[in-house]
Structure formats: C-alpha cells, structure tokens
C-alpha cells in the first residue's frame, strides 16, 4: 500500500525550481561514502502510518560553522541557503518509527550531486537513505526523487521580514501554513535551539503524502514563545 502511494506521488507531482538555494555550487569531488550500519537495537520494521518532511533553517545551522571545512559546501563563503531538506521520514504509531529497514550501500556520486542543492551534505544524504529511505523505497533514486518533489512543493514565507518583525512560534506556524494550500498550523511543528532560535520546520503528512494534523506527542516549541530567526546578511 505504501509503495502504491509512493509511486503515485512520483507521477502526480511535477518538478519545480529550487527556490531556497540562493547560491549553491555542487563540488566536483565528494567525500568517500561508506555503508552506515544501524546502531544496536535500532532496526525497526514497523508499519508506516505517516511521514514527516523536515526542513532545516540553514542560516541558523551555519551561524557558527562558516570556517569549518567539513561544512564548506553549505556554510562557506560561496554558499547561501534558506531552508534545506533535512529529510523525509516515515512514521509509525506511538512514536515508534520505522528505521534502518535494509542494506544501504554507498550512494552513487551522480545521485548525490543531483540532489546536493536540496541537501548540501553527501554524508547526510547517505544517512537519510540508510535510516529512513530504506523503509520507504527499494532504490535510493526513488526515495530522493519523492523527497525532492515534496520539498519543491513547499512555499516559504519571507524570512527576512518575519525575522525583523519579531513573531511567536504560533504566529510563524500560522504564516507558514497560510501560504501553503491545504495546510493548517496544526500540521506544522517548529523546532528551536535552547535560545529559541528557529532550527527546523517539520510538516506532518499522511500516507498519501498530504499534510495532516500532527499526531499527539510530536515535539514542537510552545506557540506563545517568541521565535528568534537568524538572518544570513552576506
């Protein structure tokens, strides 16, 4: 059933331009990728009851990493991103989520480069396929194509304006939902740092990849708390 919906997604949703990669240079050379073994006791082959699309606010991630060679492709002087895709994650009942469902060989370099401006880290792409993608698809290209379609379908608010305006988590969630048709604030989860800086936005989806109210227990920042948004002003 899940793979039937998965195949339908690939057919039904068109491709679109990447709006969040303000400046992305795909590296000629990639780090060597290795098969990632699941941590002990973490293999969970359980039924999929929904999905999370996790979007990372890159300016916050890069705030103290601009001199780190390991993050140069995302945070270096020639790289500028808004929201990047952290991952597409299958979910199970009672927060027991599918994970590490099969063997994940090192990704092909061409596939990594194809999706690099969506997720500008070869190692993160490898990890997402190993931990989450193997529970959704039989091949990595199908998993990342679905993730790319969903990512490209998301509309993003004016982050500079929201940052300067000063908003609560609840107001931000409402604005994010307002510009995405069919979405309500209850379908969005906001993740923050200990200092209440925006870290991630997570969109809850059903098994047909449509936004749904997030299940009880999904973590999110309190709606009345002030939300700080770091801006990349380079």
Which positions does each model-derived feature cover?
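Bacterial N-terminal signal peptides that target proteins for export
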Residues: 1-6
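A generic structural micro-environment signature
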Residues: 7, 59, 91-95, 135, ...
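N-terminal signal peptide c-region/cleavage motif recognized by signal peptidases
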Residues: 14-16
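C-terminal, well-folded lobe of enzymatic/effector domains
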Residues: 20-23, 27-34, 110, 121-234
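Betabetaalpha-Me/HNH-type nuclease active-site subdomain
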Residues: 37-121
């Amino acid at each position: 059933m899940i793979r039937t919906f998965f195949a339908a997604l690939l057919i039904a949703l068109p491709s679109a331009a990447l709006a969040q990669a303000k400046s992305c240079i795909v590296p000629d050379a990639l780090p060597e990728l290795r098969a990632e073994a699941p941590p002990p006791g973490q293999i969970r082959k359980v039924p999929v009851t929904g999905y999370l699309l996790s979007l990372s606010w890159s300016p916050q991630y890069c705030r103290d990493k601009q001199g780190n060679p390991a993050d140069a492709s995302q945070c270096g002087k020639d790289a500028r991103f808004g929201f990047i895709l952290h991952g597409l994650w299958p979910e199970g009942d009672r927060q027991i989520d599918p994970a590490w469902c099969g063997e994940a060989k090192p990704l092909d370099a061409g596939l990594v480069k194809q999706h690099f401006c969506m997720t500008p880290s070869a190692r993160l792409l490898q990890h997402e396929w190993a931990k989450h993608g193997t529970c959704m698809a039989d091949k990595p290209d199908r998993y990342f194509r679905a993730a790319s379609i969903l990512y490209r379908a998301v509309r993003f608010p004016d982050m500079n304006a929201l940052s300067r305006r000063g908003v609560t988590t609840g107001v931000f969630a409402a604005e994010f939902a307002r510009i995405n048709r069919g979405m309500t604030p209850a379908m969005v989860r906001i993740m923050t740092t200990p200092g209440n800086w925006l870290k991630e936005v997570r969109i809850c989806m059903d098994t047909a990849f449509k936004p749904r109210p997030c299940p009880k227990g999904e973590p999110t920042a309190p709606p009345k708390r002030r939300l700080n948004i770091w801006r990349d002003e380079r």
